[in-house]
Curated annotation (Swiss-Prot):
Top-level taxon in the UniProt lineage: Eukaryota
InterPro entries attached to this UniProt entry: Rad60/SUMO-like_dom, SUMO1_Ubl, Ubiquitin-like_dom, Ubiquitin-like_domsf
Record organism: Oncorhynchus mykiss (Rainbow trout)
Compartmental location: Nucleus membrane; Nucleus speckle; Cytoplasm; Nucleus, PML body
Name the UniProt record assigns to this protein: Small ubiquitin-related modifier 1
The keyword Cell membrane is annotated on this UniProt entry: yes
GO MF annotation terms: transcription factor binding
Processing after translation: Cleavage of precursor form by a sentrin-specific protease is necessary for function.
GO BP terms, alphabetized: protein sumoylation
CDD domains: Ubl_SUMO1
Length: 101
């Protein structure tokens, strides 16, 4: 289905950077953890979609953060400097906050 559920093919030569897989831990506001195995060059939209589907929540209502910075759909783990066992935090979008009297 997606790179989050596949295993390395083993065809990597000496330089494995682009085909390298890392494990990422996605932690929700309720401290639930879901682990993903992704390629360094996979767009993180796939991970976000998979997480949202597993949680039964629409992706647009969630915010994904890595080291305090919001993750966009076209980011890759390689671009963000992610390493094996890094953590992505997920927060429910909050709107409003202004109260009219």
């Amino acid at each position: 289905m997606s790179d989050t559920d596949t295993k390395p093919s083993g065809q990597d030569g000496g330089d494995q950077k682009d085909g390298e897989y890392i494990k990422l831990k996605v932690i929700g506001q309720d401290n639930s953890e879901i682990h993903f195995k992704v390629k360094m060059t996979t767009h993180l939209k796939k991970l976000k979609e998979s997480y949202s589907q597993r949680q039964g929540v629409h992706m647009s209502t969630l915010r994904f953060l890595f080291e305090g910075q919001r993750i966009s759909d076209n980011h890759t783990p390689k671009e963000l400097g992610m390493e094996d066992e890094d953590v992505i935090e997920v927060y429910q979008e909050q709107t409003g906050g202004l109260r009219n009297n």
